[in-house]
Amino acid sequence: MKKILTIILLFLSTSILSANERDAQLDKLFNELKKNTSSSSSSIAQQIWTLWSTHPTDQKLTSILDEGSRLVQDQKLYKAIEVFTKAIELDPSWAEAWNKRATVLYMIGKYKESQNDIDKVLNLEQRHFGALAGQGLVNIKLKNYEKAIE
């Protein structure tokens, strides 16, 4: 029993370290993004998207998010919402799951629900430029033009 607890604690500490390393990587990339020219900015932004879209500790959740993204590409939007909701239920602290669902909600015209999810994203990751852009689009659709400019 003691050996099993040791293994579990070792696994959990490795997962926590991975999440901390991921946060450090994001901080580094955002600092680079601030300093770089537009020619290298898209490469840095893509690296950030990759980190956001990869769950820090659970490959199964990454696979669920990928499945939802495939459903969006296939225009199966309501099914995609179900899949993204499942990812949110499994880890409500994963900003990208909220962001993906917010995007699909926007696509089907559920702007207030999309804004609610965007608020969650920005509470979890205030630098999420995808959510910030989405927030502007939602505010335009809701005719909140002053907020859209912010």
Language model regions located:
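Register position in tetratricopeptide repeats
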Residues: 54, 73, 107-108, 141-142
